[in-house]
Amino acid sequence: MATQTDLAQPKLDMTKEEKERLKYLQFVQAAAVEALLRFALIYAKAKDKSGPLKPGVESVEGAVKTVVGPVYEKYHDVPVEVLKYMDQKVDMSVTELDRRVPPVVKQVSAQAISAAQIAPIVARALASEVRRAGVVETASGMAKSVYSKYEPAAKELYANYEPKAEQCAVSAWKKLNQLPLFPRLAQVAVPTAAFCSEKYNDTVVKAAEKGYRVTSYMPLVPTERISKIFAEEKAETEPLEFHPLD
């Protein structure tokens, strides 16, 4: 017969497991495990296909295990502990942020939740309007109402956001170009992105010409300006070439 202590043990273990589980950064741990499993699978396949070199590979593998094994046993928990520490810091930051968020912002959030809750009521009212006036008239009236209400705010938001977005894009591009192999990948990806941007611009322009007012919310991608910005950035980051004197 199980004692009271035995029955309580799973509960204690579960509590410990919950404490060990990361609250915010669990996706980092999951990604690391996934990467490790993929690497192990690739390594195992490569070793199986190494043919005559397999004994040499296994010999090197054994030597590496002999040297690295003690170091791994000593330090393998360090990354996990660092991740736990960072997770706690994130938790503290979120708690502090929640404490400092102005009541007005929380009120707006509550209003958004209330709006989501009354969405079914709005949907029923809309269905009634469709039955009364027809699909086309109802949709047209809604589009005009939404357009007149949100067009100024949308354009102002885009005008303020666009320069910051360009600045962030250039900064990210500069950092990515410092990574190994990225410039080579970019030579393939950039022309594709440029082609997609041109197709997008062409589609928006043609839709506007046909009278689709929704295209007013779809700003064109400034391909020429982006090309100019990245061309200047590339010129600034290119290494200087030194030629020997004759």
From Swiss-Prot:
Highest rank taxon of the organism: Eukaryota
GO cellular component: lipid droplet; plant-type vacuole
GO BP annotations, alphabetical order: developmental vegetative growth; lipid droplet organization; lipid storage; positive regulation of growth; positive regulation of response to water deprivation
UniProt xrefs under Pfam families: REF (PF05755)
Signal peptide: none
Sequence positions bearing N-acetylalanine: 2
Protein name: REF/SRPP-like protein At3g05500
Entry's transmembrane regions: none
InterPro entries reported in the protein's UniProt record: REF
Species annotation: Arabidopsis thaliana (Mouse-ear cress)
Acetylation among keywords: yes
Record's keyword terms, sorted: Acetylation
Family recorded in the similarity comment: Belongs to the REF/SRPP family.
